[in-house]
């Protein structure tokens, strides 16, 4: 029999596996499955806040103090836009920060319809934050959760650290995923040291 679980539970278990101890959140309709999963996950403290900006700033402060990835969870629409300031702060200060936002169901996304908004409280948050994050994506397939989470953690913590953003539609949060069949993210091989090549070039020039 295939072992499945909710996408939201997979995300919570992934965070625990990466050593995350606390998630700062404001529950909402757009992230209800994720909020439930964070509250139920063993080893993970769900820290409710009064405002999404406070979530992002608290997660950024957590990152500074612990030298680990800080995690904030917000809902869709204004919940997501309220967290932008925290992402901007983490970008400027080079802090590894993961912001997870809820999103309307995939069927309610405006896509290329020409509409500015289709689903209730829908905002294209990914386009808004691309300029201040190292990685920002709306997860369109639950089986890609592992790939996006691994890539986000890798980019947040390597090179110059910084914020990353995952936008997760409601039907992926609450829908079944099969972890054993998920693809992972393989970081690109590090570039070969340039010192020897540079020395050889200088030698040829001289």
Language-model-derived ranges and their functions:
Residues 1-206:
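N-terminal alpha/beta PP-like core and its mobile active-site loop of ThDP/TPP-dependent enzymes
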